[in-house]
């Protein structure tokens, strides 16, 4: 399913945008509740090969982001800019003692390209060691802006639902988010929310779309 939020697409923008901002971020109603995990990245330390620890306030410290796209590097804005081969991102979150994983929501802010649902997957390992890959259930285009220098900003949200139904044991011991991108795209910011409740949280997949206050200017 592909969704467009109201007034999400802007034709041309001259005003600067906050670096590391996710415009109209999709926030699950269960964020910060018991048995949920949140991690976010507003800046990156490594463009290729090294780990990037989640740096957004309130993040679970066990999550790290790696990019293995050949030719990628940190650009002048501190984003991970893909070379011709594109990005090859792995976001890992450690191991768990057979917990049920009900839902996952991912927000991406990118420049000059976007990640399609066919380029993203969630890798799950169950209590029996079986590995399963699943694709996003829905994709929402939450914001798109074209700037006077020709650069294009996009904010997208990807949702995975009823995840434990894909696993033979119904429980997750390991998870990893993986996605690739077209060449030249820059990853500006990312968040991930995971719901580990045995009973689905109220409004398990309800999302609140929040605006963003400009706090830091893009370094262009």
Map each language-model feature to its residues:
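Short beta-strands within extracellular/lumenal beta-sheet-rich domains
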Residues: 75-100
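Short, surface-exposed beta-strand/strand-loop-strand elements in extracellular ectodomains
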Residues: 116-129
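N-terminal targeting leaders for non-cytosolic proteins
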Residues: 20-83
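Extended extracellular/luminal ectodomain segments enriched in beta-structured repeat modules
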Residues: 96-105, 170-172
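C-terminal cell-surface anchoring/sorting signal
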Residues: 1-16, 203-220
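Extended, low-complexity, turn-rich repeat/linker tracts enriched in Gly/Pro/Ser/Thr and Asp/Glu
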Residues: 96-100, 110-118
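Extracellular carbohydrate recognition and processing domains
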Residues: 131-166
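Short beta-strand-plus-loop segments that form exposed binding edges in beta-rich domains
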Residues: 176-185
């Amino acid at each position: 399913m592909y969704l467009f939020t109201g007034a999400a697409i802007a034709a041309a923008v001259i005003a600067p945008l906050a670096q590391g901002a996710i415009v109209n971020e999709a926030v699950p109603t269960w964020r910060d509740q018991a048995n949920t995990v949140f991690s976010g990245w507003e800046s990156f330390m490594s463009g290729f090969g090294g780990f990037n620890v989640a740096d957004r306030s309130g993040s679970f410290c066990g999550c790290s982001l790696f990019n293995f796209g050949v030719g990628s590097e940190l650009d002048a804005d501190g984003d991970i800019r893909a070379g011709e081969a594109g990005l090859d991102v792995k976001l890992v979150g450690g191991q768990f003692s057979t917990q049920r994983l009900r839902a996952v929501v991912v927000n991406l802010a990118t420049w000059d390209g976007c990640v399609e649902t066919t380029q993203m997957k969630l890798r799950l390992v169950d209590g029996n060691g079986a590995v399963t890959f699943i694709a996003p259930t829905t994709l929402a285009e939450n914001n798109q802006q074209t700037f006077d220098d020709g650069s294009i900003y996009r904010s997208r949200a990807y949702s995975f639902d009823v995840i434990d139904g894909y696993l033979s044991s119904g429980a997750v011991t390991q998870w990893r988010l993986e996605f690739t991108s077209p060449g030249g795209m820059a990853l500006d910011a990312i968040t991930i929310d995971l719901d580990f409740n045995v009973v689905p949280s109220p409004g398990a997949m309800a999302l609140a779309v929040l605006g963003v206050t400009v706090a830091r200017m893009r370094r262009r």
